[in-house]
Each structure stands twice: as C-alpha cells, then as structure tokens.
Amino acid sequence: MDGKILNKLKGKTTPKIKEPDEFRVILLNDDYTTMDFVVEVLVVLFHKDLEDANRIMLDVHKKGKGIVGQYTWDIAATKVEQVHAAARENEFPLRCIVEPV
C-alpha cells in the first residue's frame, strides 16, 4: 500500500475514549441514626479508615450531609442500596443519595 494512504487512515481511525461519568455518594443526617452506626457503615461498606470515617460522620452530623466518595454510576447506585439495606436491617432511617459531579 501507498504510504500516503496509511498516513491518512492512521489519523482518522484513532477512537476517542470518553471517561465514564462520576457521581458523588452523600450520606444525609437524621435525628435517629447513631454516630457509631454511620462510622461502621463508612468503614465496612466504603472501606474508609477510622479517621476518615469519623471526619465524614461529623460532616453528616454538623453540616447535614457528608460526601463519602466519587464513583461510576453502577458502583454509586450499589453503594446506596447497600447503605439503605444495612440501615433497614438495623432499624435506622439513614439515607444516602447520589448526585452528578
């Protein structure tokens, strides 16, 4: 093949890869869920160390919400379901939401 044809094709066939959209997982404050349970959720479900878990829990308590992390949609939605299931199982009204970054 002619080198000119290959050069023309080379530039046009490079696919553009788009990174997946990111979403924030946010815990919301309520008057019933204990601080200890929130910390436990952060450590067990989100794999936060104790220091980060306590910082996020205090944000939830003092500011009304705390950003847990950024994930792709599938992971964020799964995390929310896990939080709600754990809260139901332990009879707490803890809520968690997802918002686009």
Predicted feature locations:
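Terminal domain-initiation and capping elements
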Residues: M1-V101
